[in-house]
UniProtKB/Swiss-Prot annotation:
Zinc finger (FYVE-type): 642-700
Post-translational modification as stated in the protein's UniProt record: Phosphorylation on Tyr-389 and/or Tyr-400 is required for interaction with BMX and endosomal targeting.
Subunit architecture: Self-assembles through coiled coil domains to drive ELVA (endo-lysosomal vesicular assembly) formation. Interacts with BMX. May interact with SSB. Interacts with RAB4 and RAB5 that have been activated by GTP-binding. Interacts WITH RAB14 and RAB4B (GTP-bound form); the interactions allow endosomal tethering and fusion. Interacts with ARL8B (GTP-bound form); the interaction is required for RUFY1 endosomal location and promotes interaction with RAB14.
Residue positions, PTM Phosphoserine: 620
Protein name, as recorded: RUN and FYVE domain-containing protein 1
Keyword Zinc-finger set for record: yes
Keyword Zinc-finger: yes
Pfam families referenced in this protein's UniProt entry, alphabetically: FYVE, RUN
Phosphotyrosine: residues carrying this PTM: 389, 400
Ranges for region Disordered: 1-57, 493-522
Source organism of the structure: Homo sapiens
Gene Ontology molecular function: identical protein binding; lipid binding; protein-macromolecule adaptor activity; SH2 domain binding; SH3 domain binding; zinc ion binding
Region annotation (Interaction with RAB4) ranges: 615-625
Length: 708
């Protein structure tokens, strides 16, 4: 339809008159019993009747040829608009003229809405019939699909506000479609892809591309429903009487749900989407009058049957509504009786409450008199209390000063405690550091243990040497003691011999006097013997002194050896103490090693569990990816028909009798035998099936990643 500019009735008649293109397209004839109806202003239903009328109207057919009805509608429109203009001219100027103009524009908008809604019904029906005959897959060259987009564009442009800018006036339906991106996040992909198309230069082209993509996604009805549900946002773009703002918008959304059955493959590249708005081709929906003359009786019968079914359905609906209303009336009568009972109870309660109110007033007066008396008494009491308060305040001030001092002392104590706490925290950190150092010390003590063992072995060897030396010294001491005892015996013998000699000398001296002569002779012999004996005595004295010196030196050596033995005993006791400490450290080390082994076992078990969990997770992720790809393959990849493909997708060679067509069971596209000679097992097929080269390499990479 051409855009309306508002004016005389003749102009409106020209706009509503359909432009017929020569040459009938596919599906140019309607079935018998179908018609397209252009409604007059007087026949328009109210907004409340639209909801109930849409259900039976879906089953209704069209009962007259569209051309005659279109001419009749244009005549009615011209007559009604002419009468409206004459009435406006007769009333003359001011507010009355504006009111009639507004009423005329509202009527015009209502007629346009009804015509567009019926046109949308026709275009969707013809599109579905042609799609069913062709196999439910459509492309951009399909004539009913093109006409559907033209009608859809007219519906979206109906009642659209004109936006003024510095460049000029702009009237495009892409503005409200952009709101879908904010209301429905799923539509963001469509909006971004439309904006990124470099071929589109105008907002009209972007809006058409958006409609193409939404139809291919099978979500056109959902997106438009979201828009219509948010009419407060649409009011910025549309007039209040626009199609998208009224009930007809919801009807069109319900009709668009049926298009989700179709598969549309529309290529946006190479399409001139920025061109002017197309004209609706009524040749797709028209039949010749000659063809319709033969089926008039059949049409009348079908009309009568349809009207009969419609009346029966209305009767059923009305009987149901009557029953519902009867039940509602019964419920309302019951509630009314209950409310009357409650009202009587409420009136009785009000009377009792009024009596209680009078009693309370009398009690209030008595309480007031008593309160006045009590106020005088309390005044006297307050004076006494003031004096006591002043006295107590002085005491409280003193108490406050004492408490303030205590508070200061407690603050000091608190600061000291905080310092101690900080010290304890420091000690705790030092303990943690000491624990770490202990671990280091254990390693160092292990090294010192090895060194101490070596030192123990050396000390044992030294002790053995010293023990042997002590034994040798004791044996030599025993020998020397024996020699001393022998020398003492010899000296005793010499002393006894000396005594004997002295006795002999005395005898000799006595005998000398008696026998001087004999002694004089023997004196020389005895003198020589005495000198020899004296020499022997001196030698024996020298030997005794040397033996005594040797004894002293041996005693000193013995004492030194005893000291060394005592020192060695002390060192051995210290070493034993250290050995005991080392044994305690060994026990601690063993306990720590056992704890370490247990912790290592727990760590290894946890690592094994983590590895197993990682393997399970990786396997589950791979399974999820396989399932997602299978779902994508089931959802996204369209199974191409043999008629749609003329060339191989990979090598782009034309199919012939020798070069046959083969489907890839993974992506659904058609390839030649050389490009799809591989076979692989897929999750959706139990046996190995034919796969193209690209899918074969991709599946092999995935299998290798899962195996690794």
């Amino acid at each position: 339809m051409a855009d309306r500019e508002g004016g005389c009735a003749a102009g409106r008649g020209r706009e509503l008159e359909p432009e017929l293109e020569p040459g009938p397209g596919p599906g140019s004839a309607l079935e018998p019993g179908e018609e397209f109806e252009i409604v007059d202003r007087s026949q328009l239903p109210g907004p409340g009747d639209l909801r109930s009328a849409t259900r039976p109207r879906a089953a209704e057919g069209w009962s007259a040829p569209i051309l005659t009805l279109a001419r009749r509608a244009t005549g009615n429109l011209s007559a009604s608009c002419g009468s409206a203009l004459r009435a406006a001219a007769g009333l003359g100027g001011g507010d009355s003229g504006d009111g009639t103009a507004r009423a005329a524009s509202k009527c015009q908008m209502m007629e346009e809405r009804a015509n567009l809604m019926h046109m949308m019904k026709l275009s969707i029906k013809v599109l579905l019939q042609s799609a069913l005959s062709l196999g439910r897959s459509l492309d951009a060259d399909h004539a009913p699909l093109q006409q559907f987009f033209v009608v859809m564009e007219h519906c979206l442009k109906h009642g659209l506000k004109v936006k003024k800018s510095f460049i000029g006036q702009n009237k495009s339906f892409f503005g409200p479609l952009e709101l879908v991106e904010k209301l429905c996040p799923e539509a963001s992909d469509i909006a971004t892809s439309v904006r990124n198309l470099p071929e589109l230069k105008t907002a009209v082209g972007r809006g058409r591309a958006w409609l193409y993509l939404a139809l291919m996604q099978k979500k056109l009805a959902d997106y438009l429903k979201v828009l219509i549900d948010n009419k407060h946002l649409l009011s910025e773009f549309y007039e209040p009487e626009a199609l998208m703002m009224e009930e007809e918008g919801m009807v069109i959304v319900g009709l668009l749900v049926g298009l989700n059955v179709l598969d549309a493959n529309l290529c946006l590249k190479g399409e001139d989407l920025d061109s002017q708005v197309g004209v609706i081709d009524f040749s797709l929906y028209l039949k010749d009058v000659q063809d319709l003359d033969g089926g008039k009786e059949h049409e009348r019968i079908t009309d009568v049957l349809d009207q009969k079914n419609y009346v029966e359905e209305l009767n059923r609906h009305l009987s149901c509504t009557v029953g519902d209303l009867q039940t509602k009336i019964d419920g309302l009568e019951k509630t009314n009786s209950k409310l009357q009972e409650e009202l009587s109870a409420a009136t009785d309660r009000i009377c009792s409450l009024q009596e209680e109110q009078q009693q309370l007033r009398e009690q209030n007066e008595l309480i007031r008199e008593r309160s006045e008396k009590s106020v005088e008494i309390t005044k006297q009491d307050t004076k006494v209390e003031l004096e006591t308060y002043k006295q107590t305040r002085q005491g409280l001030d003193e108490m406050y000063s004492d408490v303030w001092k205590q508070l200061k002392e407690e603050k000091k104590v608190r600061l000291e405690l905080e310092k101690e706490l900080e010290l304890q925290i420091g000690m705790k950190t030092e303990m943690e550091i000491a624990m770490k150092l202990l671990e280091k010390d254990t390693h160092e003590k292990q090294d010192t243990l090895v060194a101490l063992r070596q030192q123990l072995e050396e000390v044992k060897a030294i002790n053995l040497q010293m023990f042997h030396k002590a034994q040798n010294a004791e044996s030599s001491l025993q020998q020397k003691n024996e020699a001393i005892t022998s020398f003492e015996g010899k000296t005793n013998q010499v002393m006894s011999s000396m005594k004997q000699m002295e006795e002999r000398l005395q005898h000799s001296e006595r005998a000398r006097q008696g026998a001087e002569e004999r002694s004089h002779k023997l004196q020389q012999e005895l003198g020589g013997r005495i000198g020899a004996l004296q020499l022997q005595l001196s030698q024996l004295h020298e030997q005794c002194s040397s033996l005594e010196k040797e004894l002293k030196s041996e005693k000193e050596q013995r004492q030194a050896l005893q000291r060394e033995l005592q020192h060695e005993k002390d060192t051995s006791s210290l070493l034993r103490m250290e050995l005991q400490q080392v044994e305690g450290l060994k026990k601690e080390l063993r306990e720590l090693q056992d704890e370490k082994a247990e912790l290592q076992k727990i760590c290894e078990e946890q690592e094994q569990a983590l590895q197993e969990m990682g393997l399970h997770l990786s396997q589950s992720k791979l399974k999820m990816e396989d399932i997602k790809e299978v779902n994508q393959a089931l959802k996204g990849h369209a199974w191409l028909k043999d008629d749609e493909a003329t060339h191989c997708r990979q090598c782009e060679k034309e199919f012939s009798i020798s070069r046959r067509k083969h489907h890839c069971r993974n992506c659904g596209h058609i390839f030649c035998n050389t490009c799809s000679s591989n076979e692989l097992a897929l999750p959706s097929y139990p046996k190995p099936v034919r796969v193209c080269d690209s899918c074969h390499t991709l599946l092999l990479q995935r299998c290798s990643s899962t195996a690794s």
